[in-house]
Regions:
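Conserved alpha/beta-hydrolase "acid-adjacent" motif
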Residues: 179-185
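Active-site loop/oxyanion-hole signature of alpha/beta-hydrolase fold enzymes
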Residues: 35-70, 218
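Gly/Ala-rich beta-loop-alpha elbow adjacent to hydrolase catalytic centers
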Residues: 71-75, 79
Length: 234
């Protein structure tokens, strides 16, 4: 029988989960069993170009039914789509500075346009800045070609995501200092989800596991325990 965990995490657009180590270590010390999933193309090597449907299928296979799952940034986007497609999949969804809100912007058009050209790119400051804005990665020209195209697919998928269809009880944790997915996007998600709670944290950036690992661990511990007690009927 495979091991079960208290919390499953899908990380954001990163090629290493090492910055999560402090938060995960604290949760482990407190008795919370966490499974950090490695996203194909990011922390699990792959040359494939991914569509959101590919990531939804992957997440569905990796996370057992009835689990509590957290998605950070692009990981939140994946889980929102999973819950939209399979309403009864998760018992509870935790969104940490999540992606998934479509906003028309010149920067997105720049990234999308250049990625679709498919030609080798020179280092272009405006493109690097836009790429960093949506991924946290600073050099677009050095990103793997398949993941440049995958990023475009992820951004485009937000157009089709129907947040109102996400019926899973959702807890939205957001940093007020987040400049990648700004607080207004948290409010948008909160207002559209049928069953959601929203809490802002004054000192958190887009990556609370870096800006406040202890505070993030504390917030997650308290939330997971509350949900477990609620599920046990206590």
């Amino acid at each position: 029988m495979s091991e079960t965990y208290d919390l499953y995490i899908i990380h954001g657009w990163t090629y290493t989960v090492e910055p999560w180590n402090r938060t995960l270590a604290i949760l482990k010390e407190q008795g919370i069993r966490v499974k950090m999933l490695h996203v194909p193309g990011l922390t699990e090597p792959s040359k494939k170009v991914y569509e959101i449907e590919d990531y939804v299928k992957w997440a569905d296979a990796e996370i057992p039914d009835g689990a509590i799952a957290l998605g950070h940034s692009n990981g939140g986007r994946i889980l929102l789509n999973l819950c939209s497609n399979k309403p009864g999949k998760l018992s509870n969804l935790i969104l940490l500075d999540s992606a998934g809100v479509y906003e028309v912007s010149a920067k997105k058009k720049v990234v999308a346009g250049l990625a679709k050209i498919g030609k080798p790119l020179k280092k272009i400051p405006v493109v690097d800045k836009a790429f960093h804005r949506f991924t946290g990665t600073t050099d677009y020209s050095k990103a793997p070609e398949n993941m440049k195209k995958t990023l475009v697919n992820m951004l485009e998928s937000d157009k089709k995501l129907n947040l109102e269809s996400v019926a899973t009880p959702t807890f939205i944790l957001w940093g007020k200092k987040d400049t990648t997915t700004p607080p207004r996007q948290a409010t948008t998600i909160y207002e559209k989800l049928p069953h959601a709670e929203l809490k802002f944290y004054a000192n958190w950036t887009h990556a609370p596991y870096i800006s406040d690992p202890e505070g993030l661990a504390r917030a997650l511990y308290n939330l997971v325990k509350k949900l477990q007690n609620r599920g046990a009927g206590k």
